[in-house]
Amino acid sequence: MKINLKSSLYFIYFLITGLAYAQNNTIAGTISDNSETVPFANIYLKGTKIGTSTLEDGSYILKNIPAGTYKLQVSVLGYQDFSTKVTFKNNEHKTLDITINPASEQLEEMVVTGTLKAVSRSESPVPVEVYSPTFLKKNPTASIFEALQNVNGVRPQINCNVCNTGDIHINGLEGPYTLVLIDGMPIVSGLGTVYGLSGIPNSLIEQIEIIKGPASTLYGSEAVGGLINIITKNTLEAPDFFADAFVTSWGEFNIDVGAKINLGKKADMLLGINYFNYDNPIDNNGDNFTDLTLQDRISVFQKWNFQRKENRIFSLAGRFFYEDRWGGEMQWTPEFRGGDEIYGESIYTRRWEILGKYQLPIKEKVLFSFSYNDHSQNSVYGDTPYIADQRIGFGQFTWDKSLGSHDLLIGSAIRYNYYDDNTTATTSVDEVVIPSLFIQDEISLAKQHSLLLGMRYDYDKRHGSIYTPRTAYRFKITDNDIIRLNAGTGFRVVNLFTEEHAALTGARDVVVTEELKPEQSFNVNLNYLKKIYADNGTFVSIDASVFYTNFSNAILPDYDTDPNKIIYDNLNGKSVSKGVSANVDFSFPSGFKFLLGATLQDVSQTENGVTERQILTESFTGTWNASYEIKNIDLSIDYTGNIYGPMRLPTLGESDPRSDYSPTWSIQNIQFTWKGLENFEFYGGIKNLLDWTPNRGNPFIIARAHDPFDKNVTFDANGNVVATPNNPNALTFDPSYVYGPNQGIRGFFGLRYRIN
C-alpha cells in the first residue's frame, strides 16, 4: 500500500492543531471574602493536574483546559472550602469571580463561651451564635449596645427618654438577666450593665458570642437569661494599624483607632482608643427636651500577650472609660446641674477595668483567670442626686482534664462586690463575697452523641447555699444536621438602683413592699442547626430554637397599681418567657448574601390567677441583613433592618392620652462601601430610612415635659394627682414611656484605613 506523504503530513497537522484548539479553554477571575481579596488561595480542577494559587491581588487564571465538565475547588486556611461545577466546550474563555466565606461566619468557627473550652461550633453541646467584625461593619455604630440591634432575639432597650441609658434584652427577658463578658470575664456588670456598654473599641473585637438561655453553672447567677461574650483579638490576627472614623448629619463623631506594638521577642501589645462626641441638641418632636442625649466619651484599651514555654497562656488587659452625658430641657447648661429651675439629667462616669489569664507552669492544664473593675458615677436626675461606687473583683481556677470519653472541667471561683450610694435605701456599704465550686463533664456517648452534665455551688451569706445544675445533649445526625437540647436553672439577687433606671428618674415614688427574695428560674432550649452546600456554591444555614423559661420570686416593676408609684415586690405567682426563634443565612457565589431572623415569643406574668403580658416585651421581632458586592467597581451595598411587634407600655392611668401599646415599628438602614483604594475603605449611607420615631400617633412622649418638677401639679391628701384646668388628665412628669430611639433619619459618612 502506497502512502501519500503529503496527505499524511496534512492529517498530522490538523490532528495537532485540533487537539490544541480543543484544549484552548481558560477560566480567570478574583477570589475575595466580601470585604477584601484573598491572596494565595489554592484553586484547581478536581481530578486533574490543572491548578494554581491566587496572586497578592486575589486574581487567578487556569489555562489549557480540555473540553469537559469539572469540579472547580478553592481552599485556603481560615476559610470555608468552595466548589462549583464548570463546563467547557471548545475555545471558551470564562470569567468567574468567587466569594469564599471566612470560617468565623460559618458552622466550623471556634467558640469558647458555651463550655469554657475552645471547640468548633458544630462540636459544642451548647448552641452559641457568633458575630464577626464583618457583621458589625454592615451597620456601623459607636457602641456595642447599638451594634446588637440587628441580632435576632436580642433587643437594645432604651430605658429613659432623657439620658438614653439602656440594657440588652434576650428573648424578651430584661437586661439584668443578661451577663456581658469581655474575654470571658464578668467585667460589664452591676452599674456597668447600664452605663458600661459603650466605648469598647470595635477595631479590637474578634467576635461576639451569644448564648440565649441559662449559663449559670459556669458563669454564676447573673447569666440567668443569656450571655454576651465580647472576645478581643489576639496579636496574630490584629492588623499593625487600624483607624475607623465616621460622622453623621446630626453632628455625631466617632473614631476608633487600633495598633499592634511589639515589646521585644516575647511580648506584644494591642492598643485601642475609642472617642465619641455628640454636642448638638436637637428637638424634632417639639417637647423642649433633647431627642438624643449629648455625650463626650473616651475609652482606652490595652491587651498584653506574653510568649511562654509550651505555648502556655499569659495575657493581661485593661480599659479606662470616661463619659460625660446629659439630656433634658433644651436650655439646660451645667450651671443648672442638680437644681430645680431647668430639668436635666447629667451623668459623669469614670470606670477602669483589668483582667488577665495565667496558665500554671505544671503538667496539668490549670488556668487562673481574674478581673477587677472600679465604677464611679456622679449623676443628677433633675434635682435628685445619685452618687454611686461599685467595685467588683473576680478570680477563678479551672482544671481542664480528659479521661477516656469524659472531658472534665473543674473549677473554683470567688467574687467580691462592693457597692455604696447616697440613696436612703442604702444605709451602709454593701460588701458581699461569694465563693463557688463547679464541675462540668462532657461525655462522648458515641460518635454522634454527647452529653454535658454540670453543677455549680455558690455560698451567699444573705441566702445560704445555692445549687445550680445544668445539662445539655447533642445529637449530630450528620455533619450538616445537629440537634441540641439544653436545660438549667438560675438564681439572681436584685439591686434595684444599679439595674432599674426608672427608680431614679421622673416623679414616681419607688416603693419596696417587702424584703426581696432572690429570683429563681428554670429554662429549657431545643436547637436545630442545618447547613446546605449546593453544587453551584450556594450556602444555606438554618438555625432554629424553641425556648421556655419559668421564673419564681420574679421581681418586676409594677407601674399599674398606682400611677404615681413604681412598686417592687416578689411576684406571687410565676413569670414565663416562651417562644420560637430562627435564623436563615443565604450566601450565593454571585456575591449576594442574605440573613433573615425572626422570633415569636410570649412573655407573661401570672399573679393571683391573672395572666398578663409584661411591660416592654414584644410578641414578635424580625431582623434582616442583605449584602451585595459589585466587584468590577469595588462597591458593596448593605441593607439592614429590624421590625418589632407591639409592646405594652407604662402609662399614668386610664386618663393618660398616650397609647397603652406601641405600634409595629421598624428601623432600616442602607450603606455603600467603596474599596477601590489600597488599604482604604470609604463608606456612607442613611440610617432610619423610614424616619420612624416613637412620637408618631401620640400627643406626646414625655408627660408634662413643660413642668418637669411638678410645680403646677395638685395632689390630694392621699398623694393622688387631682385633675385641674392646667392638668386635665391628672398627670405627673414621666419620661419612662419609652420603647425605641427618638433619633430620626440621618446620613453618615466614614473612612477606614488598615495596615497589615
For each predicted feature, which ranges?
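Gram-negative outer-membrane beta-barrel transporters
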Residues: 444-448, 541-550, 570-652
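Membrane-embedded beta-barrel scaffold of Gram-negative outer-membrane proteins
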Residues: 266, 365-379, 476, 484, ...
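Flexible loop and strand-edge segments within Gram-negative outer membrane beta-barrel domains
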Residues: 278-299, 305-366, 372-391
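Extracytoplasmic beta-strand/coil segments of soluble accessory domains associated
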Residues: 145-186, 206
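N-terminal periplasmic accessory domains that precede
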Residues: 94-99, 144-147, 166-169, 181, ...
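Short, acidic, small-residue-rich periplasmic hinge/interaction motif at the N-terminus
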Residues: 32-36, 42-46, 75-79, 89, ...
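Short acidic/polar hinge/loop motifs at secondary-structure boundaries
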Residues: 63-64, 169, 185-212, 300, ...
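C-terminal beta-signal and adjacent terminal beta-strands/loops
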Residues: 643-650, 674-756
